[in-house]
Amino acid sequence: MLVDELGVKIVHAQHVPAPYLVQRMREIHERDENRQRHAQVDVQRRRDQPERGQHQHRRNRDADHHPDGRTLAGQIVAHPVSHRVRQPRPVAIADVLPRVGPRADCVVAHSLQGSPRRRERRRGQTAHQRLGRRSGNAIACPLYLENAAGPEPDTKRAEGRRFGAFGGGDLRWMADRVPRQGSGRRGLGSRSGAGVPQGADARGWRHTADGVPRVGQPAIRRGVPGFWCWLDHVLTGFGGRNAICAIEDGVEPRVAWWALCTDFDVPRSMGRRTPGG
């Protein structure tokens, strides 16, 4: 036969996959390869960043139920990276450090609007109630910490305890009254330079002894030795970024948590750059 002479083999009932099935299998194979490649890159990145292991070692070393061996400032500065998504950092810190509770008397600039009775009612709200509440492009942020084991009476706290507000619209934070106890300082004025403390210019740059400008000014020093509550606001393309930093005496300031004045999520890592920052 002609078929035998040409060496052509006839195969009966052979399955031929449809073209769309072949394309589908190729897509699945490429997806698996991409996942494997991304996993390898992530493993390599973890090896190249030893601070990830340091954070884990710190979590294992400093148990949450043994906070008495460190000062309050040390607990906040050495706080591990929050592993929660869409979780405000003050809430995460309050969960780890039960003896410390964030609280803000006057949080957002929008809370200064309305009738006096309404402002007083808003001022009585706690920071936990305001953290998830946004008004415009501003989000509530606590301005200081206090020891929950010895809280002050409400009557004493309500009078003369308004530390300030941070407005997302005009990027201004006010501190009209600051306690005079201890090493407390008067807070900042607006960006126009009114009320700026000594050593800072109208833009809010604070020049240290070595001449290096640093953004932010000390807002208030609480009764806890070595603890400073530091308010930074860095102008970005998306609005203002408000950071509360906790530092110990003689130690460079480190961010304890972030409070964003944008619509982005709160960063999960300590000191991570925000979008546009």
UniProtKB/Swiss-Prot annotation:
Composition skew (Basic and acidic residues), residue ranges: 31-54
Statement: the UniProt record of this protein carries the keyword Transmembrane helix: no
Keyword Ligase part of the UniProt annotation: no
Phenotypic consequence of gene deletion: The Rv2743c-Rv2742c double mutation reduces intracellular ATP levels under surface-stress conditions to less than 60% of wild-type levels.
Biased composition (Basic residues): 116-133
Induction (free text): Expression is regulated by ClgR.
Pfam families, sorted: DUF3046
Coiled-coil region: none
Record-linked InterPro entries: DUF3046
Ranges where the record places region Disordered: 31-70, 113-133, 180-210
Function: Involved in preservation of envelope integrity and tolerance to surface stress. Reverses the inhibitory effect of PspA on ClgR activity. Facilitates intracellular growth of M.tuberculosis.
Name this polypeptide is given: Putative envelope-preserving system protein Rv2742c
